[in-house]
């Protein structure tokens, strides 16, 4: 059994005998799957938005921080959870070989400002993010050596405050729009890679109880289904703010390889410090 220090089990790699879920949960109730409502999840959800999958599953879409809370409260059974939330669960299981990661620049998780890093005095934190905010704090203190004031936000108005020495962390699809407006753009995944030499994992599929090996196999297949249709999925979005074909194929990494899991483990280690 593979386990890290935060009581997180990598279920898709455990022996089959370790997955003993009550049959009634699988057979009598739909499994509620919470996913992020950003463009980068479209390829993962491609294989879940069909009649066969939806006969036994219900999809719940929201932004990252809400999905984590929904999992804690039992509103969903499985969630695409921000990596920074993993230590907050008493016990959790990573139940898929797929997630949201970046090997180099991610393009959609950036610090935007009108001045260079060393001149930033205030940073407004995107209210939709947990992992990205945690990553920003690690970069600030461990690598950049800056200590601006950090301000929590509650609505979309925070982006209007990017002026003078005030910057903002913006994630998701809105980051593509902000890239056209701001003078300085610091890609957090690229910065992480530059300092650690590792990919960064933003989100993983998590459950709070073991899932059966049969379900995990089915769920992995659903995640994998869209990987052969990235161009078609990109074109179907009719999105003009960023080249989604490039985004899906070169910026976002969906498979949780060993190297990407090493990046996740390194991030979780630093979370304990910061």
Predicted regions and their residues:
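Cationic, low-complexity basic patches in intrinsically disordered or flexible, solvent-exposed regions
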Residues: 10
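Domain-level signature for soluble enzymes in the chorismate/prephenate branch of the shikimate pathway
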Residues: 2-3, 16-274
